[in-house]
Amino acid sequence: DEGAGRVYLTEDVLRGLLADAPADVRFGQRTGDTHTVGACAGGTVRWPGNALYLVDGAQRRTLTADDFARLTRLVDRLDNVQGMVGVSVGDFEPTVRDFCTLRLMAQHTGKHLRPVITSLSGVDAVMEMTDVLAAGRDDSPISFGYSVVSPLRWTATALQLIQRTSGRGLPFMFNAEPLAGGTSPVTLAGSLAQAHAETLSGIAIGQALEPGRPCLYNAGFAHTLDMKSAVALGGSAEVFLMATASADLARRWSLPCSSWVSSEGMTEDAQAAAEKSMGLTLHTQAGVNLVWGMGQLESQMSISLEQLVIDDEIAAQVDRLQRGITVDDEHLARQVLLADPAERGDLLAHEHT
């Protein structure tokens, strides 16, 4: 409908476009490692998220270039955070911010890089750096993404970014960020239905421009609107439910999926620990392939070095839960249980221990 500025996709057209989308995505690192996750490969990787502020003691403040360098170096040393995401660095003018933050990330970590594009004015420079960093590699160390404007609107900026990053095999994450009761229906099922349509439409655009491009289904950036405070909640049970359900929706289309875990906690307190623990556990158990939000607080507005370390430890515990209990002859400790009772009296010295 050209007059209304609206595009309709039939089910046959949609299925035809999405048939080319890979079930798995490879996140390369400049260290040489690659993390492959998706509908077939399974697995979960975790990144921080875009933030406006740094939590500094009992205060928050605008992020500086030095702050971001410290955050990036910390991420580089954490075992359970597999990539770094750009943030809003106050030292840089908006026209060069995207390029400058990508340069800082590349200087301070060898892990996967996810620049956050805030202006098309810097895309050409970002793409030149991307070509240098990804030269000769099948598993790009850089990926991109953009969010739909709910309800059901892909902006000119989003469409240009999808187009200008096409043709290189770079992973692209298509984000729906429904706000239940605000920009999407107040019911969880209604919000999910809208987010599902938004995400699939984005992936269809990506596949039309570059068939076979690795695309991530991300209806897991969902929020609920607190009707008393007008705050977009990121750590509520309803948000966790929508994110875990979105993983099931992605698997129906054999697509890798993503989500975001955050907390309404303003600092590294018990509320943040509870909400981050619940979120990271549920999202991982639901099979979400890429979880954003490591270190984030205040409904995703802020990030904390201390919370990053705490979340890394939570992620280690979650991964241990995922591995479960190994049951075989060795782990059943047959040689210990069936040994002479006298030998069982000193298990610390036993070879099995």
Regions found by a protein language model. Give the residues of each.
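Glycine-rich anion/phosphate-binding loop at the beta-strand->alpha-helix junction
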Residues: 146-311
